[in-house]
């Protein structure tokens, strides 16, 4: 691709990733992933999903085994945003933080999501420094 075309493709991809965060907040995860609220609330997070997240990679679909993995996977889209303005928008709009305010009855999952929020705050701050 020429540089101009690549620029437009990256802008569209960034916008799509940001919109995916919005959709996953506005539409109940139970509806998107065809899972019961009970299954979602007791869901663990797959260790391989956490490994990919902490390596700052987008989580591959093939790694996801549990419903909570989808929220982690969507949050990991932030690592592939191309432009500083996209990162600023993600933080400002708040969809990411609302997605990560994941309601769970599983204490290990609650701890994982707290750590994920902390890591994303740290990572976003480092990107804007």
Question: What do these predicted ranges mean?
Answer:
Residues 2-129:
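Divalent metal-dependent phosphate-bond-processing catalytic cores, especially two-metal-ion Mg2+/Mn2+ enzymes
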């Amino acid at each position: 691709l020429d540089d101009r075309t690549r620029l437009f493709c990256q802008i569209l991809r960034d916008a799509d990733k940001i919109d995916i965060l919005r959709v996953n907040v506005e539409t109940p995860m139970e509806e998107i992933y065809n899972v019961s609220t009970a299954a979602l609330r007791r869901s663990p997070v797959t260790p391989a999903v956490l490994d990919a997240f902490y390596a700052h990679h987008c989580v591959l679909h093939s790694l996801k085994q549990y419903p909570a993995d989808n929220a982690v996977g969507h949050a990991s889209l932030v690592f592939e945003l191309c432009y500083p303005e996209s990162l600023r928008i993600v933080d400002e709009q708040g969809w990411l933080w609302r997605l990560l305010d994941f309601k769970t009855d599983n204490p290990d999952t609650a701890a994982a999501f707290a750590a994920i929020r902390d890591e994303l705050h740290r990572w976003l701050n480092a990107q804007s420094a």
